């Protein structure tokens, strides 16, 4: 009698362990990266609703400071802070801030998609105009700061940008 009961507990334990492994394995398979640039074809995520500017109209990118963080908002209707957006190659992009007495810096590292590929450093009275030139998907750092602030620059954000051919 004890032998059968022990066997029942063992088979139930094995079945439960198998179910747990199966569920966790399928959850890992469905888990996607939160970054668009990690997708196989990030350009396929571009739509008219998330494409900024055109050959005849510049794309404005507003970099603001909010508490201890910074936000990047493209000039797209209903845009959200730090959202992924697209720009067609050849489009003029204007980096600016709508915050008074605020500076900003944008860094693409060693592979900037813009011409000129100098660091993008500006402020409330100094917009920076560049031209999108190198197609691809880019993760970049953006930060904002107040002149004379005790804690200096805000925490950077890590938004993404696709330059379309």
Tell what function each PLM region has.
Residues 2-14:
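Bacterial N-terminal signal peptides that target proteins for export
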Residues 13-23:
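Bacterial N-terminal signal peptides
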Residues 25-29:
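Sec/Tat signal peptide C-region and signal peptidase I cleavage site
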Residues 31-45, 49-52:
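N-proximal, low-complexity, solvent-exposed accessory regions that precede a main structured/catalytic
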Residues 48-92:
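N-terminal edge beta-strand
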Residues 97-103:
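Short proline/glycine-enriched turn/loop motifs at strand-loop junctions of beta-rich domains
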Residues 103-113:
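Short, surface-exposed beta-strand/strand-loop-strand elements in extracellular ectodomains
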Residues 118-165:
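Extracellular/periplasmic metallocenter environments
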């Amino acid at each position: 009698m004890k032998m059968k009961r022990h066997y029942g507990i063992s088979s139930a334990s094995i079945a439960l362990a198998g179910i747990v492994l199966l569920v966790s394995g399928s959850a890992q398979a469905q888990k996607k990266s939160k970054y668009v640039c990690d997708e196989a074809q990030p350009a396929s995520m571009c739509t008219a609703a998330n494409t900024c500017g055109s050959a005849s109209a510049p794309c404005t990118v507003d970099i603001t400071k909010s508490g201890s963080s910074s936000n990047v908002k493209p000039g797209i209707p209903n845009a959200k802070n730090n959202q992924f957006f697209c720009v067609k190659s050849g489009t003029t992009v204007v980096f600016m801030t709508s915050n008074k007495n605020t500076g900003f810096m944008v860094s693409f590292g060693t592979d900037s998609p813009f011409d000129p590929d100098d660091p993008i450093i500006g402020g409330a009275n100094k917009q920076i105009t560049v031209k999108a030139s190198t197609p691809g998907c880019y993760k970049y750092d953006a930060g904002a700061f107040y002149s004379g602030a005790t804690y200096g620059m805000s925490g950077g954000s890590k938004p993404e940008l696709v330059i379309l051919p």
